Structure formats: C-alpha cells, structure tokens
C-alpha cells in the first residue's frame, strides 16, 4: 500500500495485512536496500503478521531522495508510523536499519515491545575506502560489501542494492559513519534489546560487538553459517531466532 508522508509517496509493505491479534515485526532495511530483503523470511502465519517494511526515501518504491543522516530516516519513519496503532510490535533493524531502529527507540519516537539489531552495532565503522567507492557509484560500494560480508556464493545478491546512478549508497554509508547514539540514554530504553550477528561477518568487529552488547545489557545471538546477509544466507535459522525472541 502507498501513503503520502510529508509530501512523499511512500510504500508500506504488508501493512494492509496486519491483524491486531498477531505479533508484528517491523523490519528496517540496510544501506541501499528496500522491502525485498525480507522475502525469504518465514514467520509462523498463525502467530505473526507478514514482515512489515516501510521503504525509506529514495529507496525501493518510495519517492524523494536518500538522506545522509540517521536521524532524518528515523524522523521519517516516526511520521510514517503515526497513523498506525500496532500492538505487540518488535522493531528489527538490519545494518543501517539497526541504527535507525536504535534512534527511534532512544528518541521515544514510536512504541515497541522489543528491539532487534541485526548485523548492526553502534558506532558503525565505515572505512574511508568504502566511502570513496560509494562516491564512484552504488555498484562499487555494493561489490565491497558483498566481498567482505557474504559467507557463500549467492546468485543475484547484488540485485538487492541499487544499480542506478544516484548517490543512495554514499548517503546511507555517510549516515552510518557519522551516527553517534547518546549512550547516556541506553539505560532508559526500557525494552529488551537483542543482537543477531553472522559468525562469518567480516564487516563487524566481534570485540566491538561485545562492548556494544554490554552497554545495552543485551544478548548476542550468532548464526554460525552466515555473514552480513543472514536473511539470504540462512533465512531458516534467522527466522527461528526472531520467532524465539519476539
């Protein structure tokens, strides 16, 4: 379904299928991605609504241009969710989406019963070389992320990233690099926070992840046979973990 948010035609994935008696998980996509990243997930139909996604500005089916600040994305999602009263909601942010989800919760911008950070920690280390590649074009940045993030060969994985000539990847990666959450607010989150990481993800430092988890008083779940793309590398294990913690 589509709605206009701040004069932006916005795509809401599966929102027309929400049943109030079921659990809901709002997924927030990573850099350059859109609602298609959840297509391999399998949550129980009798217990869960289909995966919910709102395409960010300049991503997927949503109009306008991408942003280079996490706070702009979280503010947009806050506005987009304003008209919805979704009970029993978990927010699950993937990579960049994890930073957006964290900012939503820290800013009390939308109520949720729990938070899942998928392949996402803060601060997020984004190298200068990756920024330079993104400045050359979306496909160059995508190649880098796939090279160091993917644990196995998957045909078509690059199709999850934008192939056009805009600067979506540059904006998104800049937003990730510059985002610094207010750690003083961590103790005020007030809901369970769980972190899911791929055991073969070379884009996230495991020691930094441990420090981040301690700061949030959260538990880390690891998918041993996945890298930075568990929703494609091991969607069954990922789906089972999500079901067990929501």
Regions found by a protein language model. Give the residues of each.
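Conserved alpha/beta-hydrolase "nucleophile elbow" surrounding the catalytic nucleophile
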Residues: 29-31, 89, 93-98, 198
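Short beta-strand/loop motif that positions the catalytic acidic residue
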Residues: 189, 195-197, 201
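Flexible "cap/lid" loop of the alpha/beta hydrolase fold
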Residues: 99-142
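Conserved alpha/beta-hydrolase "acid-adjacent" motif
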Residues: 202-208
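Conserved HGGG/HGGXW glycine-rich cap/lid loop of the alpha/beta-hydrolase fold
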Residues: 8-63
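Catalytic histidine-centered segment of alpha/beta-hydrolase-like enzymes
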Residues: 226-239
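Active-site loop/oxyanion-hole signature of alpha/beta-hydrolase fold enzymes
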Residues: 36-40, 50-92, 240
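Conserved alpha/beta-hydrolase catalytic His-Asp/Glu region
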Residues: 132-188
């Amino acid at each position: 379904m589509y709605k206009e948010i701040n004069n932006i035609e916005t795509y809401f994935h599966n929102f027309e299928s929400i049943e109030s008696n079921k659990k809901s998980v709002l997924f927030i996509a990573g850099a350059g991605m859109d609602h298609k990243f959840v297509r391999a997930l399998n949550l129980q139909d009798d217990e869960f609504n289909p995966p919910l996604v709102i395409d960010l500005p300049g991503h997927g089916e949503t109009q306008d241009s991408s942003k280079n600040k996490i706070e702009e994305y979280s503010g947009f999602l806050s506005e987009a969710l304003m008209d919805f009263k979704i009970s029993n909601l978990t927010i699950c942010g993937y990579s960049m989406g994890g930073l957006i989800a964290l900012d939503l919760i820290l800013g009390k911008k939308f109520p949720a019963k729990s938070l899942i950070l998928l392949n996402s920690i803060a601060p997020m280390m984004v190298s200068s070389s990756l920024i330079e590649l993104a400045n050359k074009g979306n496909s160059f940045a995508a190649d880098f992320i796939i090279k160091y993030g993917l644990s196995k060969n998957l045909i078509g994985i690059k199709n999850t990233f934008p192939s056009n000539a805009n600067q979506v990847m540059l904006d998104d990666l800049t937003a990730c690099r510059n985002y610094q959450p207010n750690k003083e607010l961590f103790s005020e989150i007030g809901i369970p926070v769980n972190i899911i990481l791929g055991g073969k993800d070379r884009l996230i430092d495991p020691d930094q992840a441990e420090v981040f988890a301690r700061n949030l008083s959260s538990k880390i779940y690891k998918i041993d046979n996945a890298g930075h793309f568990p929703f494609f590398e091991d969607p069954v294990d990922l789906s089972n973990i999500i079901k067990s913690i929501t």
